[in-house]
Amino acid sequence: MLQIALPNKGALADGAVTLADEAGYNCRRRGRELSVRDPDYGVEFVFLRPRDIATYVSKGIIDLGVTGLDLTYDSGADVTHVLDLGFGAARFCYAAPKSSDLTPDAFTADTRIATSYDTLVRRDLEQRGVDARVISLDGAVEISIQLGVADVIADVVQTGRTIDEAGLATIGAPILNTEAVLVAQNGHTMEKDAAQHFAERVKGIIVAREYVVVEYDLPEEHLPEARKITPGIESPTVSPLNKDGWVAVKAMIERESVNAVMDDLTELDARGIIVTDIRTCRM
C-alpha cells in the first residue's frame, strides 16, 4: 500500500487534505487519527509534523509527502521534487525593527539572527560570506528582538501582518519563495502505479484551478480573430449553429484572463458568453 504523508497541523494541513479530497481520495480524519486508509486506491495517508515529512520520505519510510519547500530545504533531506501544489505560498525573509537601517549585506559576526530554519539561514550566510550568529528557536521568533535575544529574525512571511504587529519589516530580497510541494524519495517511487495516479490526479486539480472553460456564439467571419483570443490548449472546439453564418466556440483559457477575454470577444460581436469552472482535467 502506498503511504503518503500529509501535514498534521499548521498552514499547509487544510490545503493538503482539500487537494487530496478533491482528487478523489478518502483522507479526512475523524478526530486525531494518525493515519487514514483508502483501500479502493491502495493508499494510506499518514499525518506527520510538516517539518519531519521530507526526512521520512528521504529515508524511504514514506513514499510521498506534502510539505513546504522551505521545510524541505531546511531539513537537508535528499528528496525528489515532484510537483508544486499551488497553495501555501510565502516568502522566507530576514526582518528587523522598522527603525533599523540594517540590511543583509551589512550583517557581521556580531549580528544575532533568530530563526526556526537554521539550515536555510546558514546556507544563505555562507553564500554571502558572513559568519553571523544563528540563534535557534522553535517558533514565535518575532518576540526575540523585543526580548533582546536577537537583532534580526529569519522566518516565513505570508501576509506580513505578524511581523508588522511586532514592529518589524522585511529587509533585503527574500531568501526563498516557498509553497507546498509534493516530494518523493527518488525517481523509482514514481514508477509505482499508485504514485503515478496520485500525482496525475493532483496535477489535474492544480491545472483546473488555473483554467476555466469559455463558451460563446460568434459570427463565423470573426472566427480567425476569436481563435487568437481563445486558442485553447491544442485548438478551440468550433461547431456550426443552426443559424447561417454563426458558430459555437469552446476553449480553455487562463482564469486570470477571463474578464479581458470577455471584453475582447464582446468587441467581436460574440453572444451568450459563458464561463465555467473546471473541477479537474488532464492535459
Curated annotation (Swiss-Prot):
CDD domains membership: PBP2_HisGL1 (cd13591)
GO cellular component: cytoplasm
Catalytic reaction list: 1-(5-phospho-beta-D-ribosyl)-ATP + diphosphate = 5-phospho-alpha-D-ribose 1-diphosphate + ATP
Cofactor: Mg(2+)
Annotated EC: 2.4.2.17
InterPro entries named in the record: ATP-PRT_HisG_long (IPR020621), ATP_PRibTrfase_cat (IPR013820), ATP_PRibTrfase_CS (IPR018198), ATP_PRibTrfase_HisG (IPR001348), HisG_C (IPR013115), N-reg_PII-like_a/b (IPR011322), N-reg_PII/ATP_PRibTrfase_C (IPR015867)
Family designation: Belongs to the ATP phosphoribosyltransferase family. Long subfamily.
HAMAP family on file: HisG_Long (MF_00079)
Protein name listed in UniProt: ATP phosphoribosyltransferase
Organism listed in the record: Salinibacter ruber (strain DSM 13855 / M31)
